[in-house]
Amino acid sequence: SEYRQKRTVGEEVTTDMRHVDESHFLTTTHEAYKPIDPSEYRQKRTVGEEVTTDMRHVDESHFLTTTHEAYKPIDPSEYRQKRTVGEEVTTDMRHVDESHFLTTTHEAYKPIDPSEYRQKRTVGEEVTTDMRHVDESHFLTTTHEAYKPIDPSEYRQKRTVGEEVTTNMRHVDESHFLTTTHEAYKPIDPSEYRQKRTVGEEVTTDMRHVDESHFLTTTHEAYKPIDPSEYRQKRTVGEEVTTDMRHVDESHFLTTTHEAYKPIDPSEYRQKRTVGEEVTTDMRHVDESH
């Protein structure tokens, strides 16, 4: 009876056929797709509007833009510049100047006077200053001294007072080029690898590494042979001896939560009936539209 729709008082029995309406499934909003009345498309006319308004779109420039004024025929007179009072009629010829289109800044491209390139001389400067650039090393660098011919004697190291002449042979040492730190690669004395013994240490310490588990890990204790007794669980006082067999239960490995996979009692699937529920409730699912 839950599936039966509630009828309002006075609703006819034929309500079961409400879904027969053809437009029912067109949309969830029944009104949205109902047949459209063509008269709805007709624009509402204001009082006094002439009947000839249907022809308003005949104007040729109507579709040029949504802004009617923007594309209306342009009056050529609009392009004529406004002249101020007293301006001469010959102002139309102002653009005849040849350098007008060279730049927007008229002065920038005016013919250049070559005399502008001549440097100003200070009072008393000699006339021969025009030849200052004849020096051969002038263009070697902007810093004249940087590229002047190098004196080979500059490469010779300065010797301190009393240094022997034989210092030129200092680089003959074989280990000189091994590193910039001469001491770092000098021949290593094997005796350096021998560990220093503390006073009283026995001579037999050289054999300390003979222990088999020495190289198993840097933590010697971590890999020492494991005592199987360590795996045995500690029993609390009073625990029965049969606790060793606790894992024999078949469902032990089903899950870490023992109760979750225990055998299910089929009676658990039976729904609880409320007091007074009829015995025929088992057939509630027979309804075809369930």
Curated annotation (Swiss-Prot):
The keyword Membrane does not apply. Its main location: cytoplasm. Coiled coil: none annotated. It comes from the Eukaryota. Keywords: Cytoplasm, Cytoskeleton, Microtubule, Repeat. Residues 259-290 have a biased composition (Basic and acidic residues). Sequence repeats lie at residues 1-38, 39-76, 77-114, 115-152, 153-190, 191-228, 229-266, 267-290. Residues 251-290 are annotated as: Disordered. One of its GO terms (cellular component) is cytoplasm. Disulfide bonds: none annotated. It is found in: Cytoplasm, Cytoskeleton. Made of tandem repeats of a 38 amino acid segment. This is Microtubule-associated protein P320.
